[in-house]
């Protein structure tokens, strides 16, 4: 971020002295100046080689360094601000509160003054004559800013001196300080000139100062949430146009979530929401700082008599600049994404509730809209669109003023995806956070919207695979008696099934998605037995939730029977088969001994019951099965994805459905197959059919009870803190909760009692994650109260027991004495 610039172009960058960190300008020929040709590496070497022989008079003594202006303090005894150390101490406090706002600029040193120059416009912001610089000091490794240059300046018109602090990265503060001090010394008129030696010393410091890179940094490796979204725009657009509103399948996708999956997803969404709120708060503070600088600048200009700039006005002018438009657009996108998350989390968060946070967000939203001069810029932000649930939630929550602001932002803030034309491309939104944080991936089928977008976009890249799936779906539709049911095929493609192919443009992708009804589909009946056996190793424990799934333990070796969907059908070493999610499996080489296909002992599984009570394969063509239940006949049709699509219309003969999606799907298929068998085999009466169905249902219940499988949980040590905890305990606890280093360093110096004494506002002031810290502290306090309450109860019971024992003891002694007297 920091750098430095000199005055002449070169092949190494903007200026020739960029390699050695200073901008001293040796003598060049007039021809070089006129033609402005770029200096070659050899010429640059010769210039540096001859520099030592140049006379002092031939050196222009101008050097430039790229620095970050951190802050400026007025040295005043009333504010306990007297020395540079006082300024560094206050800088640390501001840094802990997140209130240091850096500004990139160029610090120029010549034989008359130290100047600050705007990096973009190259205008001079400040000019400190050397005789006004009272003190120059380098402060190294004293805080998170490890190379701070301190300048104490006082112009004749000032009553109190100013302390300016700069962070110097590429050229360290001690070198710049030596340059400035030598210039001050030479300006006082000594016989021995110090500055040429100082510049030579900086020049010789080349090995410790690496040159800036010639090329930009390479792009980081893509993650699931950040994978070349632009290159898949055309593919995703074609898919979106073909499928419509991509939000609909998500509603059904989450119905099979286990409590653990839901808790992980909610925790992830809460983390994203917290980071969004932090970034919005940071941006609002940045706007406020710019407004304060502008107000102070206006006040100074109003009170100023002459046209000459006063001390500090140049830096104020730079700080008064508003953020660039890209940052405004990013902030508006985070507002919209935040509203979507609040609608998702409205049933899961409290203190503050989702409605409270909506009201909280509309205040800064209004500020940002006003800062842009009206709603035009906000109205241009298309992605992300608000979900239908979000729009309903906002309609129910907002008050009159908030509704007026919301409506002024237009259709991009008020219409869900279904209300936009199918052919209009809505780019997927992947949030980028200021501190570089990325949301954690969820290792189960409840993938995030960003992951779904990537997987869906990637699926289009492999057209052949998509056509095969379309044919399978069409085949299933033709053979299914439940004509109203449509499998959820195509909404949650697994990224590891598809390989990256050449990207299609939008037109080609759209053509690829058109149904190919004239193709023959018998090739899909090719038996799976002809394929070589494949095996996978389980990465985690998995507990089956119904009879179609298979419970596995970590490191189990499983034979893959069908891997064409997101849930794979596998067989374990005992011969039991069922479905498991593919993201807990790793493909492995076949074991030498093989798993064997010996018939396992008889167990009441749903697969065997279907073979006994269902129709024979020869009697009935295959029918599609709702996810994740496998087909009841041994025809190798792939299982559907585990995201069930509810049946909107079912035949009248289906009267009962189990609450489990798998059992429900199974009953639909069984009923449909039974009714298709009736015209062929009428030997059974209606009463026998009812008895068979009753026996079937009861047997399924018994087999489900027998298939319960408990996986032992690993004992994870829990770290807690109390009022007696040491600062080291507090630091360990903060690290165990996953707080960032700024929070750990800011609060890790406190003991337990000090940490518990802070309220929410104080925590937010000290660290950016104050709200999360406060929530965790509240949990710890509640746990301490529970434990202390039980301890107090035990103490009361112990004392009461002692009293009873003492009373009984006294009574026994008295009786003995009485007996003796008698």
UniProtKB/Swiss-Prot annotation:
Residues 531-590 form the SH3 domain. Residues 649-822 are annotated as: Effector region. Residues 64-194 form the PTB domain. Residues 762-767 are annotated as: Helix bundle 3. It is linked to Deafness, autosomal recessive, 102: A form of non-syndromic deafness characterized by profound hearing loss affecting all frequencies. Vestibular function is unaffected. Belongs to the EPS8 family. This is Epidermal growth factor receptor kinase substrate 8. It comes from Homo sapiens.
């Amino acid at each position: 971020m920091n750098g430095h610039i000199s005055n002449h172009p070169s092949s190494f960058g903007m200026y020739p002295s960029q390699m050695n960190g200073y901008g001293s300008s040796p003598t060049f020929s007039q021809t070089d100046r006129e033609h402005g040709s770029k200096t070659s590496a050899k010429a640059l070497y010769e210039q540096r080689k001859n520099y030592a022989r140049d006379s002092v008079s031939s050196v222009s003594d101008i050097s430039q360094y790229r620095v970050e202006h951190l802050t400026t303090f007025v040295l005043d005894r009333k504010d306990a601000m007297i020395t540079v150390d006082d300024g560094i101490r206050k800088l640390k406090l501001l840094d802990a509160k997140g209130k240091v706002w850096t500004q990139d600029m160029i610090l120029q040193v010549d034989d008359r003054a130290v100047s600050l120059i705007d990096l973009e416009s190259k205008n001079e912001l400040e000019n400190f004559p050397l005789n006004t610089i009272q003190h120059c000091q380098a402060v190294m490794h004293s805080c998170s800013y490890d190379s701070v240059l301190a300048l104490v300046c006082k112009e004749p018109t000032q009553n109190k001196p100013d302390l300016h602090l700069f962070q110097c990265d590429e050229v360290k503060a001690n070198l710049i300080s030596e340059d400035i001090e030598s210039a001050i010394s030479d300006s006082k008129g000594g016989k021995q000139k110090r500055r040429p030696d100082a510049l030579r010393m900086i020049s010789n410091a080349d090995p410790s100062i690496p040159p800036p890179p010639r090329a930009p940094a390479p792009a980081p490796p893509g993650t699931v949430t950040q994978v070349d979204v632009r290159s898949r725009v055309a593919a995703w657009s074609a898919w979106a146009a073909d499928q419509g509103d991509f939000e609909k399948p998500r509603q059904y996708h989450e119905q099979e979530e286990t409590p653990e999956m839901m808790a992980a997803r909610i925790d992830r969404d809460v983390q994203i929401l917290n980071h969004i709120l932090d970034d919005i708060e940071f941006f609002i503070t940045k706007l406020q700082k710019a407004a304060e600088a502008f107000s102070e600048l206006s006040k100074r200009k109003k009170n100023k008599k002459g046209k000459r700039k006063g001390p500090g006005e140049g830096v104020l002018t730079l700080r008064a600049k508003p953020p660039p438009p890209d940052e405004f657009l990013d902030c508006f996108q985070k507002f919209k994404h935040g509203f979507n998350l609040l609608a998702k989390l409205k049933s899961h968060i409290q203190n503050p509730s989702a409605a409270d946070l909506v009201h909280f967000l509309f205040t800064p939203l209004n500020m940002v809209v006003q800062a842009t001069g009206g709603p035009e810029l906000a109205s241009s932000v298309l992605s992300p669109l608000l979900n239908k649930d979000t729009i309903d939630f906002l309609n129910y929550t907002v008050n009159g003023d908030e509704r007026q602001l919301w409506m002024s932002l237009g259709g991009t803030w008020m219409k869900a995806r279904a209300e936009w034309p199918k052919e209009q491309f809505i780019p997927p939104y992947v949030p980028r956070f200021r501190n570089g944080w990325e949301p954690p991936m969820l290792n189960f089928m409840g993938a995030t919207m960003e992951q779904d977008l990537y997987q869906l976009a990637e699926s289009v890249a492999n057209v052949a695979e998509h056509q095969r799936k379309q044919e399978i779906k069409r085949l299933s539709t033709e053979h299914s008696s439940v004509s109203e049911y449509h499998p959820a095929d195509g909404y949650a493609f697994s990224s590891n099934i598809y390989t990256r192919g050449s990207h299609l443009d939008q037109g080609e992708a759209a053509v690829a998605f058109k149904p190919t009804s004239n193709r023959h589909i018998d090739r899909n009946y090719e038996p799976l037995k002809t394929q070589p056996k494949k095996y996978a190793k389980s990465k985690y424990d998995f507990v089956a939730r119904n009879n179609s799934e298979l419970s596995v333990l970590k490191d189990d070796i499983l034979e893959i029977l069908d891997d064409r969907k997101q849930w794979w059908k596998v067989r374990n070493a005992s011969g039991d088969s069922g479905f498991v999610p593919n993201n807990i499996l790793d493909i492995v080489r076949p074991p030498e001994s093989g798993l064997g296909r010996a018939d396992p002992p008889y167990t009441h599984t749903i697969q065997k019951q279907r073979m006994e009570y269902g129709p024979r394969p020869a009697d009935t063509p295959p029918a599609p099965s709702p996810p994740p239940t496998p087909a009841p006949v041994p025809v190798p049709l792939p299982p559907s994805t585990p995201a069930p699509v509810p049946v909107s219309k079912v035949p009248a003969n289906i009267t009962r459905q189990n609450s489990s999606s798998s059992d429900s799907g199974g009953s639909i298929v069984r009923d449909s197959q039974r009714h298709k068998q009736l015209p062929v085999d009428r030997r059974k009466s209606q009463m026998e059919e009812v008895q068979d169905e009753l026996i079937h249902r009861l047997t399924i219940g018994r087999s489900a009870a027998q298939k319960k499988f408990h996986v032992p949980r690993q004992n994870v040590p829990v770290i807690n803190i109390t009022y007696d905890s040491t600062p080291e305990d507090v630091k360990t606890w903060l690290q165990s909760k996953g707080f960032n280093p700024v929070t750990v360093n800011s609060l890790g110096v406190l003991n337990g009692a000090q940490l518990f004494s802070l309220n929410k506002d104080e925590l937010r002031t000290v660290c950016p994650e104050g709200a999360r810290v406060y929530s965790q502290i509240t949990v710890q306090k509640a746990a301490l109260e529970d434990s202390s309450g039980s301890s107090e109860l035990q103490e009361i019971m112990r004392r009461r027991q002692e009293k009873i024992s003492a009373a009984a003891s006294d009574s026994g002694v008295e009786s003995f004495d009485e007996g003796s007297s008698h």
